């Protein structure tokens, strides 16, 4: 028999919804927000790599 934990009791309602499809948009807007934030993060990393984003006191030397 499985042991009950507080974390398991907290997560159980999420697991009970497994396989069910909620009508409408659901959490799609939240996913869109996180995708946009991830895109901004990638753009910042690309600009640092490309040296087009200049950070004071931070030198990027890729030669090793």
From Swiss-Prot:
Presence of keyword Membrane: yes
Q: How is it modified after translation?
A: Phosphorylated in vitro in the presence or absence of light; phosphorylation is inhibited by oxidizing conditions, DCMU and zinc ions.
Reading the lineage from the top rank, the first entry is: Bacteria
**One of this protein's Pfam families, by short name?**
PsbH
What is the induction note for this entry?
A: A monocistronic transcript that is strongly expressed.
Q: Name one GO cellular component term.
A: plasma membrane-derived thylakoid membrane
Note whether Plastid occurs among the keywords. Answer: no
Sorted alphabetically, the Gene Ontology BP terms of this entry are:
photosynthesis; protein stabilization
> Where is the chain membrane-spanning?
28-50
Q: How does it sit in the membrane?
A: Single-pass membrane protein
Location within or outside the cell: Cellular thylakoid membrane
| Effect of a null allele | Reduced growth under photoautotrophic conditions and increased photosensitivity; approximately normal amounts of PSII accumulate but electron flow from QA to QB is impaired. Increased photodamage to D1, which is degraded slower. HliB no longer associates with PSII complexes. Psb34 no longer associates with PSII complexes.
Matching InterPro entries, A to Z? PSII_PsbH (IPR001056), PSII_PsbH_sf (IPR036863)
GO MF, one term, reads: phosphate ion binding
Q: Which UniProt keywords apply?
A: Membrane, Photosynthesis, Photosystem II, Thylakoid, Transmembrane, Transmembrane helix
Per the entry, what this protein does is:
One of the components of the core complex of photosystem II (PSII), required for its stability and/or assembly. May regulate electron transport between the quinone binding sites of the reaction center. PSII is a light-driven water:plastoquinone oxidoreductase that uses light energy to abstract electrons from H(2)O, generating O(2) and a proton gradient subsequently used for ATP formation. It consists of a core antenna complex that captures photons, and an electron transfer chain that converts photonic excitation into a charge separation.
Query: Which family, according to UniProt?
Result: Belongs to the PsbH family.
Q: How does it assemble?
A: PSII is composed of 1 copy each of membrane proteins PsbA, PsbB, PsbC, PsbD, PsbE, PsbF, PsbH, PsbI, PsbJ, PsbK, PsbL, PsbM, PsbT, PsbX, PsbY, PsbZ, Psb30/Ycf12, peripheral proteins PsbO, CyanoQ (PsbQ), PsbU, PsbV and a large number of cofactors. It forms dimeric complexes.
Protein's UniProt name: Photosystem II reaction center protein H
Lineage of origin: Bacteria, Bacillati, Cyanobacteriota, Cyanophyceae, Synechococcales
Instruction: Give the gene name.
Output: psbH
């Amino acid at each position: 028999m499985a042991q009950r934990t507080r974390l398991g009791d907290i997560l159980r309602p999420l697991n009970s919804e497994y396989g069910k499809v909620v009508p409408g948009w659901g959490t799609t807007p939240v996913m869109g927000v996180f995708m946009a934030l991830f895109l901004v993060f990638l753009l910042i990393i690309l600009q640092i790599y490309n040296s087009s984003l200049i950070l004071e006191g931070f030198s990027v030397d890729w030669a090793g």
